[in-house]
Amino acid sequence: MATTPLKTPKRQTAKSSASKSLASKTHTPKPQASPLARYSAYRQVGDFIFLSGIIAVNPKEGLIIQGFADIPQEAARLIGQTGEFSSDMKIGPILAQSWFVLEQIQKTVEDAGAQMSDVVKLVQYFKNLDHFPLYSRVRNLFFTGVMPTSTV
């Protein structure tokens, strides 16, 4: 008795199914927020936007954000610049870096045609976890209402 071999359906890879059903766009933003190396600042696949990591470096100026002096004066006052040297030197770097990174995220998200309320997840890296409350204070200025999920 001869048996007929089973026909297995052709396996579809994630790449092949995504490319058939979802439009994919790669973006490098305007100079004020362009990446430091050759990579996409974000990638849009269907309704999803995936951002590359953003650090506290201003590529346009070639400047590492180190304190209140490296961000607009209005932003520095808004996030907690006191004018008191010892206090500003202690908390200024993390507040200014947090503001700069979140502003770059906002610019990138808006460049992609979305808004901060569309952000569903953030991943933050800290050298010193004691800085998280200061970062969180700045983050609350950029996100209102439902907060994105977060990994620290």
Predicted regions and their residues:
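Short, polar/acidic, helix-capping and beta-turn segments at strand->helix junctions
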Residues: A2-R11, K15, K20-V152
